[in-house]
Amino acid sequence: MNNDVFPNKFKAALAAKQVQIGCWSALSNPISTEVLGLAGFDWLVLDGEHAPNDISTFIPQLMALKGSASAPVVRVPTNEPVIIKRLLDIGFYNFLIPFVETKEEAEQAVASTRYPPEGIRGVSVSHRANMFGTVADYFAQSNKNITILVQIESQQGVDNVDAIAATEGVDGIFVGPSDLAAALGHLGNASHPDVQKAIQHIFNRASAHGKPSGILAPVEADARRYLEWGATFVAVGSDLGVFRSATQKLADTFKK
């Protein structure tokens, strides 16, 4: 068995409520992803929803993270079984599912990552995740080593947070602050009191069901507040944001 992913250390850390500090990867480049993997983050999101990623760009990034202590988490573009199956086959074990609004959608996400009879994942006997058929116990181990994080970012999701958090196979609840702010009528203002109240409510309800919660918080004060509120897995920045900020600061140092 591949000791890099079995057992899934990120999944185990979440179950133990160990704080996991992460970073968002949106540059879609194996070199920048490799640098992130050397930085010491507990987890990294490789974004397939808003970043220009696909199967052909994800594979070299996974290769770049081989041996890194940072757990790769893929945000899928949509909660669709075929897309999820292909990402499983290339070697992802940790999934962030966007825009989950109901228990049924959460159940579909879980089922998409499990082989029958627990789920509906299609079977290929030779792919990158099982080292092209050379991992003898892959099928026996796979189902219990998948992490499913579902993203709540709408009013309906907030309304159904208890049912979503109680879904078997869901390992954590992730808040999408920007979309949630837009859904609550505060586009571009995730700091609005209504949005902050909703975020804290989601954290509290996740905790009530024994599930860890997470969020993207590139502003340090926000990240520390969310950790104080009980968030377990927090992405504290992005490669794109760090790169833009650092290059702008460097230019300003000499141009202004």
UniProtKB/Swiss-Prot annotation:
The record marks 75 as: Transition state stabilizer. Transmembrane segments: none annotated. The keyword Lyase applies. Binds 1 Mg(2+) ion per subunit. The active site is at residue 50. One of its GO terms (molecular function) is magnesium ion binding. Mg(2+) binds at residues 153, 179. Keywords: Lyase, Magnesium, Metal-binding. Its cofactor is Mg(2+). It catalyses: 5-dehydro-4-deoxy-D-glucarate = 2-hydroxy-3-oxopropanoate + pyruvate; 2-dehydro-3-deoxy-D-glucarate = 2-hydroxy-3-oxopropanoate + pyruvate; D-glyceraldehyde + 3-hydroxypyruvate = 2-dehydro-D-gluconate; D-glyceraldehyde + 3-hydroxypyruvate = 2-dehydro-D-galactonate. GO terms for cellular component: cytoplasm. Pfam families: HpcH_HpaI. Pathway: Carbohydrate acid metabolism; galactarate degradation; D-glycerate from galactarate: step 2/3. Its EC number is 4.1.2.20. The keyword Magnesium applies. One of its GO terms (biological process) is D-glucarate catabolic process. Belongs to the HpcH/HpaI aldolase family. KDGluc aldolase subfamily. Catalyzes the reversible retro-aldol cleavage of both 5-keto-4-deoxy-D-glucarate and 2-keto-3-deoxy-D-glucarate to pyruvate and tartronic semialdehyde. In vitro, can catalyze the aldolisation reaction between hydroxypyruvate (HPA) or pyruvate (PA) and D-glyceraldehyde (D-GA). The condensation of hydroxypyruvate and D-glyceraldehyde produces 2-dehydro-D-gluconate as the major product and 2-dehydro-D-galactonate. The condensation of pyruvate and D-glyceraldehyde produces 2-dehydro-3-deoxy-L-galactonate as the major product and 2-dehydro-3-deoxy-D-gluconate. Homohexamer; trimer of dimers. This is 5-keto-4-deoxy-D-glucarate aldolase. It comes from Escherichia coli O7:K1 (strain IAI39 / ExPEC).
